[in-house]
Amino acid sequence: MFKKKEQINYKFNEGALIKELQSYIDKTYGGHYSKNQFQSTEFIIDCGHGMGFALGNVLKYAQRYGKKEGYNRADLMKILHYALIALHTHDKNHEN
């Protein structure tokens, strides 16, 4: 029998924020970067530069936060998105 999944009472609103992040990422797949069959990020990863690219963008948006258009939530979403791309790249490079 399957156990009923326990409802977690997140202290930092993680459940809602993860849903918001997924919605943000979903919208990027309809944006100008995805008009072609392949995204430029795919080529960068395939050329072996994915980790540097992703982590460089994490740093870029972290340093920009609070400077361009104030304390912009979009910069934080971009940090999280690029961190996920870095995690994907890590997993791809370290498959067993």
Which positions does each model-derived feature cover?
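Intrinsically disordered, low-complexity regulatory regions
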Residues: 1-96
